[in-house]
Amino acid sequence: MATIKDVAKLAAVSTTTVSHVINKTRFVAEATQKRVWEAVEELNYAPSAVARSLKCNTTRTIGMLVTQSFNPFFAEVMHGVENYCYKQGYTLFMCNTEGDLEKQKHYLRMLAEKRVDGLLVMCSDLNEQLLTLLEKNTELPMVIMDWGPDSPRTDKIIDNSEEGGYLATKHLIENGHTHIACITGQADKVTCKERVRGFERAHIDANLTFNPEWILEGDFECASASRAVDKILAIEENKRPTALFCFNDIMALAAISKIQQSGLRVPEDISVIGYDNIELSAYFSPPLTTIHQPKRRVGKTAVEILLERIKDKDHERRVFEMQPEVVTRSSVSNRLK
């Protein structure tokens, strides 16, 4: 394996000059730079990250804990994170926890051993034990989605779930739907509680009552949505909901599929609105009306905030608040026409 001395010898310069060229820390004549880079390429030289981290007290690496990398919402957020890390010269260690506490502990320990400069936590499955582990890492710059711990040393991203739930339900009501069901995620999750509050507030503002039995608990996965739709379809036709609000797009798409398999039509018989605006939602049949969240922008902003915290651990706490909005497509019928 080539060393910096090998590069210096081939380029006929000092090791100090090679270091300045590679790290861009001092002006070096263009002709000299050319010789150095040609030597680097010929020898396939890679600077030692370990040596650099010891010298600069930084590894230029960021860790990321995520619930499920295959979930389209998290996948799009991760795309924004990875892309911006790359542009800023940082390497990303992505750790898929799958809700497993032992994996969470292992990854946190591994990231600490790797001496990452900062940590992004985008887990929807944070529990008290993991929160305790995170709170022990007081020296590690951290950005956490808003279901995480509230700490003056931790920057946060708030997804404004209550407003999103309100907008989704309000859109259905404005289209003449007064009998609305919803399929939530796990009832104990903060985001789900907030979206339910938004669902309820929209009914109150419209002077409508809602049926608590039509708030059906799912788990953000397809199978749970399918089971919930079975319960809705079991209701007598003239008494069943005319619209369904699903707490993420994956469940909404599964619900549409189940409704159509039963011989009913979306949106003519039952309207469906989702949440997240994942890329697939625009290409389903019918295209899904949903609540948009700026996922790639969230990823980019999370890294921006984290890099600020890495540079200045004492800077004022930052909170980035997402602004949900309705994206109207073809899965909601207008019953007022």
Curated annotation (Swiss-Prot):
<comment type="subunit">
    <text>Homodimer.</text>
</comment>
<dbReference type="InterPro" id="IPR028082">
    <property type="entry name" value="Peripla_BP_I"/>
</dbReference>
<comment type="pathway">
    <text>Purine metabolism; purine nucleotide biosynthesis [regulation].</text>
</comment>
<feature type="binding site">
    <location>
        <position position="189"/>
    </location>
    <ligand>
        <name>hypoxanthine</name>
    </ligand>
</feature>
<keyword id="KW-0238">DNA-binding</keyword>
<dbReference type="InterPro" id="IPR000843">
    <property type="entry name" value="HTH_LacI"/>
</dbReference>
<dbReference type="GO" id="GO:0000976">
    <property type="term" value="F:transcription cis-regulatory region binding"/>
</dbReference>
<feature type="binding site">
    <location>
        <position position="276"/>
    </location>
    <ligand>
        <name>hypoxanthine</name>
    </ligand>
</feature>
<dbReference type="InterPro" id="IPR023588">
    <property type="entry name" value="Tscrpt_reg_HTH_PurR"/>
</dbReference>
<dbReference type="GO" id="GO:0045892">
    <property type="term" value="P:negative regulation of DNA-templated transcription"/>
</dbReference>
<protein>
    <recommendedName>
        <fullName>HTH-type transcriptional repressor PurR</fullName>
    </recommendedName>
</protein>
<feature type="DNA-binding region" description="H-T-H motif">
    <location>
        <begin position="4"/>
        <end position="23"/>
    </location>
</feature>
<keyword id="KW-0658">Purine biosynthesis</keyword>
<keyword id="KW-0678">Repressor</keyword>
<feature type="binding site">
    <location>
        <position position="220"/>
    </location>
    <ligand>
        <name>hypoxanthine</name>
    </ligand>
</feature>
<dbReference type="InterPro" id="IPR010982">
    <property type="entry name" value="Lambda_DNA-bd_dom_sf"/>
</dbReference>
<feature type="DNA-binding region">
    <location>
        <begin position="48"/>
        <end position="56"/>
    </location>
</feature>
<comment type="function">
    <text>Is the main repressor of the genes involved in the de novo synthesis of purine nucleotides, regulating purB, purC, purEK, purF, purHD, purL, purMN and guaBA expression. PurR is allosterically activated to bind its cognate DNA by binding the purine corepressors, hypoxanthine or guanine, thereby effecting transcription repression.</text>
</comment>
<feature type="binding site">
    <location>
        <position position="191"/>
    </location>
    <ligand>
        <name>hypoxanthine</name>
    </ligand>
</feature>
<dbReference type="Pfam" id="PF00356">
    <property type="entry name" value="LacI"/>
</dbReference>
<dbReference type="InterPro" id="IPR046335">
    <property type="entry name" value="LacI/GalR-like_sensor"/>
</dbReference>
<dbReference type="GO" id="GO:0006164">
    <property type="term" value="P:purine nucleotide biosynthetic process"/>
</dbReference>
<dbReference type="Pfam" id="PF13377">
    <property type="entry name" value="Peripla_BP_3"/>
</dbReference>
<keyword id="KW-0804">Transcription</keyword>
<keyword id="KW-0805">Transcription regulation</keyword>
<dbReference type="GO" id="GO:0003700">
    <property type="term" value="F:DNA-binding transcription factor activity"/>
</dbReference>
<feature type="domain" description="HTH lacI-type">
    <location>
        <begin position="2"/>
        <end position="56"/>
    </location>
</feature>
<feature type="binding site">
    <location>
        <position position="73"/>
    </location>
    <ligand>
        <name>hypoxanthine</name>
    </ligand>
</feature>
